[in-house]
From Swiss-Prot:
It comes from Klebsiella pneumoniae (strain 342). PANTHER family: TRIFUNCTIONAL ENZYME SUBUNIT ALPHA (PTHR43612), TRIFUNCTIONAL ENZYME SUBUNIT ALPHA, MITOCHONDRIAL (PTHR43612:SF3). In the N-terminal section; belongs to the enoyl-CoA hydratase/isomerase family. In the C-terminal section; belongs to the 3-hydroxyacyl-CoA dehydrogenase family. Substrate binds at residues 296, 500, 660. Pathway: Lipid metabolism; fatty acid beta-oxidation. This is Fatty acid oxidation complex subunit alpha. It holds the Pfam family 3HCDH_N. Residues 311-729 are annotated as: 3-hydroxyacyl-CoA dehydrogenase. Its EC number is 4.2.1.17, 5.1.2.3, 5.3.3.8, 1.1.1.35.
Length: 729
């Protein structure tokens, strides 16, 4: 053994060939600060070996290196800029030493090689991969850019266009694509990986492969003519501006850095990468996006722990076909859980099966599946007008019309047709679960399972615990949701549960703005372009359905009369009374026509202004800041109340529910991350300016208390002391 660290070791493999093996405690390898330092120590040893002829890098895990240790990021990003720059310089000196070894080097790459893992293998001369490879640089999705030489080596290895596509989009690619673009030199079966890598290394040692020529382009300026460079970088900047926009500075910073470094050799180019990385790491966007990643890991780990003692349902059923029922049935079948889909009409069953078939055909058109797979999946959805097959189902989700009487009747009837241990769930969006459970003989086997539309795209499922719901029931439903590829978040019962409960105060803020003379078009523009929502409130209401919102508004007002009962006729009432239900009938705040792809496209409709004039004061202008404050304060206050009342268990789960269920702008990180970024005291000052608008603007007691003590909702991290840094070790 030449060297043994906590996460890697170095040993002789055969005459003159050394093997550096990543083998961290636990299930995966991460390129954390300690591992970078350990890699440096291993290189200290290697550089002293006079008889060294070649080096092989490999992993003992199912994945090579999954990336940097993102749990370190928040504390690392608090390190002063100069010290962070010094540590990056140290880390890059390690990878440069790996690249500059006076012998050929090869990485045997299996599974994931992402972020720092990808940057590590870029420093070797050759890369041999297994068919399960996923390799790429996802840093821009975290609000940063590659910092270990990825923005320097990848363009010089692949060419500017392919590298820009991967780096700017934060993409990873599979083995076939990686081979096609030159990111790996070969693909072999997993059992042949080590021997195959050794064979390539021996060829390089023997002179059959020119490893020095292979290495040289990574050390030199990018080989692009002026015209080629202008075209590549102009197109890349245009694409990034269109897709990422101003709220996500990392992609455009990465492109501009690669452009500026194109005429430079490795050392000078790495200096530019360092100078670009450090300011990005100190942005609110980076902290928010890293926070989302960590929150997602937390939510998934919680679901895994919750379901460790239950068996994932093997057969499921959906009550109510239609678009929603068909979407749920498709998702279950697609992920390998056969499903019975029941309705009372052939027409609805046809609609549900058509929806499932449409989604499968899209997969076929994109080349994701073949005809055999399509037929196999669709055959696991059994449409029925009766309860045939319900004796074998483990879980049933009801997705009928949003009417408590209808839902109660359907649930009670179904309970009599299933096994005593079968779990029942309701896809209600607003009706309290304990109310629906009142008609059941086994309320402990019942909970809420709130999917979001469209089911196949929206990652969130709210799992709602009723008054009598058992832990086992929750665990089974969480297991099914996870199997369906969804992110389940458990919430406690109340009108609207969590997501809709906090959405309707936001809509109420919108209604009050319109009542006071705001133009809905400007409100939409500000909330989309300035705050970053994917849709403004008027557009969102049209998509949800004005009739649906009108009904839900009444349910929420009955549940929370003190805050959500309004004493005026609002824009939603006016549009509802005029039969303008949004996209579903082509008329809402906007008029809708189908585009060439058959999708609804919004257009101006002057008729809506006269309708809104009856429920609004004369038009007046509001500043962007005032619009954002009046829209967001009611939502944030309600989010905080849900935490204080135990409806949602943690800030992390609340923020993920908002991002995954409502499209809360990821660069803000969710309501609690946004609150922490503003500061509780500053938020309180802002909210107090609008208290005259009513109870929705009154800040909850717990938040007032935090403001007094200047406390945050997320645990505050201390600046890191990176291992191996020049002046901070």
């Amino acid at each position: 053994m030449l060297y043994k660290g906590d996460t890697l070791y170095l040993d002789w493999l055969e005459d003159g060939i050394a093997e550096l093996v990543f083998d961290a405690p636990g299930s995966v390898n991460k390129l954390d600060t300690a591992t970078v330092a350990s890699l440096g120590h291993a290189l200290d040893v290697l550089e002293k070996q006079n008889d060294l002829k070649g080096l092989l890098l490999r992993s003992e895990k199912a994945a090579f290196i999954v990336g940097a240790d993102i749990t370190e990021f928040l504390s690392l990003f608090l390190v002063p800029e100069e010290q962070l720059s010094q540590w990056l310089h140290f880390a890059n000196s390690v990878f440069n030493r790996l690249e500059d070894l006076p012998v050929p080097t090869i990485s045997a790459v299996n599974g994931y090689a992402l972020g720092g893992g990808c940057e590590c293998v870029l420093a070797t001369d050759y890369r041999l991969a297994t068919p399960d490879l996923r390799i790429g640089l996802p840093e821009t999705k975290l609000g940063i850019m590659p910092g270990f030489g990825g923005s320097v080596r990848l363009p010089r290895l692949l060419g500017a266009d392919s590298a820009l596509e991967i780096i700017a989009a934060g993409k990873d690619v599979g083995a076939d694509q990686a081979l096609k673009i030159g990111l790996v030199d070969g693909v072999v079966a997993a059992e042949k990986l080590r021997d195959g890598a050794l064979a390539i290394l021996r060829q390089a040692i023997n002179g059959d492969l020119d490893w020095k020529a292979k290495r040289q382009p990574k050390l030199e300026p990018l080989k692009l003519s002026k015209i080629e460079a202008t075209m590549s970088f102009t197109i890349a900047k245009g694409m990034v501006a269109q897709t990422a926009g101003k709220h996500y500075p990392a992609p455009i910073t990465a492109v501009k850095t690669i452009e500026a470094a194109a005429r430079l050799g490795r050392e000078e180019a790495l200096v530019l990468e360092n100078k670009s990385f450090v300011p990005l790491a100190h942005t609110n966007e980076a902290r928010a996006l890293v926070g989302i990643f960590l929150n997602d890991q937390y939510v998934k780990a919680k679901a895994k722990k919750l379901t460790k003692d239950v068996e994932t349902p093997k057969h499921a059923a959906v009550l109510g076909a239609g678009i929603m029922g068909g979407g749920i049935a498709y998702q279950s079948a697609w992920k390998g859980v056969p499903v019975v889909m029941k309705d009372i009409s052939d027409k609805s069953l046809t609609l549900g099966m058509t929806e499932a078939a449409k989604l499968l055909n899209k997969q076929l058109e994109r080349g994701k599946i073949d005809g055999l797979k399509l037929a196999g999946v669709i055959s696991t959805i059994q449409p029925t007008l009766e309860y045939s097959g319900f004796d074998r189902v483990d879980v049933v989700v009801e997705a009928v019309v949003e009417n408590p009487k209808v839902k109660k009747a359907v649930l009670a009837e179904t309970e009599a047709k299933v096994r005593p241990d079968t779990v029942l769930a309701s896809n209600t969006s607003t009706i309290p679960i304990s109310e629906l459970a009142s008609v059941l003989q086994r309320p402990e086997n019942f909970c809420g399972m709130h999917f979001f539309n469209p089911v196949h795209r929206m990652p969130l499922v709210e799992v709602i615990r009723g008054e009598k719901t058992s832990d086992k029931t929750i665990a089974k439903v969480v297991a099914w949701a996870s199997k369906m590829g969804k992110t389940p978040i458990v919430v406690n019962d109340c009108p609207g549960f969590f997501v809709n409960r906090v959405l309707f105060p936001y809509f109420a803020g919108f209604s009050q703005l319109l009542r006071d003379g705001a133009d809905f078009r400007k409100v939409d523009k500000v909330m989309e372009k300035q705050f970053g929502w994917p849709m403004g409130p008027a557009y969102l209401l049209d998509v949800v359905g004005i009739d649906t919102a009108h009904h839900a508004q009444a349910v929420m007002a009955a549940g929370f009369p003190q805050r959500m009962q309004k004493d005026y006729r609002d824009a939603i009432d006016a549009l509802f009374d005029a039969n303008r239900f949004g996209q579903k009938n082509g008329l809402g705040f906007w008029r809708y026509k189908e585009d060439s792809k058959g999708k609804p496209k919004k257009e101006e409709d002057a008729a809506v202004d006269s309708l809104l004039a009856d429920v609004s004061q004369p038009k007046r202008d509001f500043s962007d800041e005032e619009i954002i404050a009046r829209m967001m304060i009611p939502m944030v206050n309600e989010v905080v109340r849900c935490l204080e009342e135990g409806i949602i268990a943690s800030p992390a789960e609340a923020d993920m529910a908002l991002v995954y269920g409502l499209g809360f702008p990821p660069f803000h990180g969710g309501a609690f991350r946004w609150l922490d970024t503003i500061g509780s005291a500053k938020y309180l000052d802002m909210a107090q300016q609008y208290q005259h608008l009513g109870p929705l603007y009154e800040v909850p007691a717990g938040l007032r208390d935090k403001a007094r003590h200047n406390e945050a909702y997320y645990p505050q991290v201390e600046p890191a002391r990176p291992v191996g840094a020049l002046k901070t070790a």
